Amino acid sequence: MKRIVFLLLVVVVLAGCKSSKHLATSEKNVQVSSYLTSKLQLTIPGKKGGSMAVGGTMKMKTHERVQISLLMPILRTEVARVEVTPDGVLLVDRMNKRFVRATKDELKGMLPKNAEFSRLEKILLDASLPGGKTELSGKDIGIPSLEKAKVQLYEFSTKEFSMTPTELTSKYRQVPLEELVKMLVAFL
């Protein structure tokens, strides 16, 4: 489960790094909503073959935040949450009661130069459009070593919803960003 949580962080944070290789050929006026939700399926290859999949949800309020919740199969209880804002990232491991909070500046050394919140928003909004790319691989977002990992987005909605910043109780302990980096390096 820890591998899933940390892989999701990498996939989400680096999703803004995907290069755009297609030109807009349509001149249709598409109204973009300030709100977007979808279900998601994260599939991670196993080290010894096979793969592991976990479902979840994605909520986005344009120019404000993206929240991704990974849900335990069958019980549908949240096991992890990733919250991305223009200023930073919060990763919450609900199973082990710990979290990492990193600012954009702290993440600069880990991320490609063009990793921006606005790029993540664009990828998610584009996926919600008819004919949009709804399955993203590690290669698509600039991480060739995670080529077989996939995030599938589906059942999009642009209905308005309420979303508040994630608040954590004293039961959760903060772990340093370096601990997260070590875990990611071991995983990759």
Regions found by a protein language model. Give the residues of each.
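N-terminal helix-cap/turn-to-beta initiation motif at the start of protein domains
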Residues: 23-36, 112
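Positively charged n-region of N-terminal signal peptides that target proteins for export
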Residues: 1-4
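Post-signal-peptide N-terminal segment of Sec-exported extracytoplasmic proteins
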Residues: 35-78
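C-terminal motif of bacterial Sec signal peptides marking the signal peptidase cleavage site
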Residues: 13-16
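Short, solvent-exposed coil/turn segments at beta-strand boundaries
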Residues: 32-35, 59-66, 83-88, 133-142, ...
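Bacterial signal peptide processing site
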Residues: 18-21
